[in-house]
């Protein structure tokens, strides 16, 4: 399933900067960055449960915000992209 994760982490103190890096690194491990604080994550149920739990452990609900958009498995026709920064097909072959 495709889940879009967006976040806004307060960086008013050094702990916020650390949380921001940790949230971004966690999202990079499961998806691709499509905007500064927005990731598209193609995950199965077990991966999603683990990712969501980790993100909820990292953020501070008093100062930060996390949003999850569940697009499901039939997401091809639900996402439109225009402009720069073309995205990679997460289901396609990976060339290294």
What residue spans do the PLM features occupy?
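C-terminal structural segments of small proteins and small subunits
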Residues: 58-96
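Intrinsically disordered, low-complexity segments enriched in polar/charged residues with Gly/Pro
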Residues: 26-27, 55, 80-81
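Short, intrinsically disordered low-complexity segments
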Residues: 35-65, 70-72
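A short acidic (Asp/Glu
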Residues: 15, 51, 79
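Extended, hydrophobic alpha-helical segments
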Residues: 1-34, 38, 42, 46-47
């Amino acid at each position: 399933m495709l889940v879009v994760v967006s976040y806004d982490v307060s960086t008013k103190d050094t702990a916020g900067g650390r949380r921001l890096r940790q949230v971004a690194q966690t999202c990079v491990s499961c998806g691709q960055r499509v905007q500064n604080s927005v990731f598209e994550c193609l995950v199965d149920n077990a991966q999603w449960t683990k990712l969501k739990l980790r993100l909820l452990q990292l953020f501070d609900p008093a100062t930060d915000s996390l949003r999850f958009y569940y697009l499901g498995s039939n997401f091809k026709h639900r996402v439109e992209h225009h402009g720069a920064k073309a995205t990679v097909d997460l289901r396609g072959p990976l060339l290294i």
